[in-house]
Amino acid sequence: MRFFAVSIVLGLAGKTFAQAADVSYTSDEAFKEAALNVTNTYRDWYNATELTWNDTLAEAGEQAVESCIFEHSGQEYGENLAAGYPNVTAAITAWKDEVDEYDYGNPDFSMETGHFTQLVWGNTTQIGCARKECGGQGEAPGWFIACEYSPHENVLGQFADNVEEQVRGPGSGAGRPEVWAVGLVGAWMGLVILGELA
């Protein structure tokens, strides 16, 4: 099997990465779009259906972040929390990265993988998220994010049916070009695409 690599260099038009990332927190529309798009991208990787945005769930998320206390709100929905990430994409990616600890041979709930399993739970159909700049007050450093999911997931005895192994995306072994690495040097971003030659 032979592999090829293609490097693409993209300019960021003089904007720094941090400046561009802040929009996902400061703009309501950008926040909603990023939360929904990143969530649905990862769900696609794990063969779960796309979620739709639900304003009632977003309002529940607002209640969860309002106090800047980093603890689950105890509402009737599934809930993922994150704080201190530079943008919403990084927060949701951290939830997805818990897959490294998930044991598909023993599919069950664990504190180490609960965010991941909520993110990709097969029976979930809707999401709503909220964020608040806590500025170090309370127990949430920086931006505090809550995403609420419905129907509620992480149901004991249902993990094998609702948390599938990765079928698409980087590392899936699907045999198609995938984004392998993204590097940032100054105002330039290098994108390496690794694929398989037949």
What are these regions (language model features)?
Residues 10-26, 191-198:
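N-terminal signal peptide
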Residues 70-74, 86-99:
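Acidic, polar low-complexity intrinsically disordered regions
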Residues 2-9:
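Sec-dependent signal peptide recognition
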Residues 67, 72-74, 84, 116-121, ...:
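All-alpha RGS (Regulator of G-protein Signaling) helical domain and cognate RGS-like helical scaffolds
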